[in-house]
Amino acid sequence: VKRDLPVGKMSGMLKIHKKLPLLLAVPTTAGTGSEVTLAAVITDETCHYKHVVMDYCLIPRYAFLDPGLSCSLPPDMTAYSGMDAMTHAVEAYCNRFCSPKMKAHAMKAVSLIGANLLTAYREPANKAARMNMLTGSYEAGIAFTNAYVGYVHAIAHGIGGLYHVPHGEANAILLPKVLAAYGSAVYEPLARLERKVRTSVAEDESREETDAVLAEAFILSLIHI
């Protein structure tokens, strides 16, 4: 995107300074959401570091979601990329700067991914599940490119660069732990997500459905996925 400039010099915000050709994105995973985001992540193998390049010119003009292109994705990659998309949505939703419009995108993503990830994993050729996963990843991409992500991604990028752990796998492991560490700061948004998608129900029906209880239920559902 910029001649004779190392990736490290483009790492960060708005450093490309160049108009790019028409960019069309056709995702084959669900996923990174890169078909609607302003970010590119490039691993420097020499120093084991992941450079994040962010610029508005990197947002594709058009995105084509074809479920048939993801039906051959292996189960492990389906799981990892699906949890990456889930993490995008949850972290964006919990961000205090997330607007109501972006919350709606994130909520839709969580609902779609939560309802379809296991089906896509178990039934790779299920085009309905694959399409719902692509749509969920797309919605999550819109949400986090506007509201950003949090500590889960910050830690996962470091681990991935140093130890070559698949990004989605790192996110899947870290997401419930980081959300639990946030404590009461995220009870309210997680409770709203749980009320909307009802991924799990408290086993003890006598327990009052407080924000804390619902947030705990949502975190447990992420572990069970």
Where are these regions (language model features)?
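Glycine/threonine-rich beta-strand-loop-alpha-helix active-site module
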Residues: 1-68
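Amphipathic alpha-helical interaction segments
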Residues: 104-108, 112, 132-135, 154-157, ...
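Gly/Pro-rich interdomain helix-loop hinge
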Residues: 162-222
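Glycine-rich flexible loops
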Residues: 36, 87, 93, 98, ...
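Glycine-rich phosphate/pyrophosphate-binding beta-alpha loops
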Residues: 31, 138-171
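Carboxylate- and glycine-rich phosphate/diphosphate-binding segment that chelates Mg2+/Mn2+
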Residues: 39-147
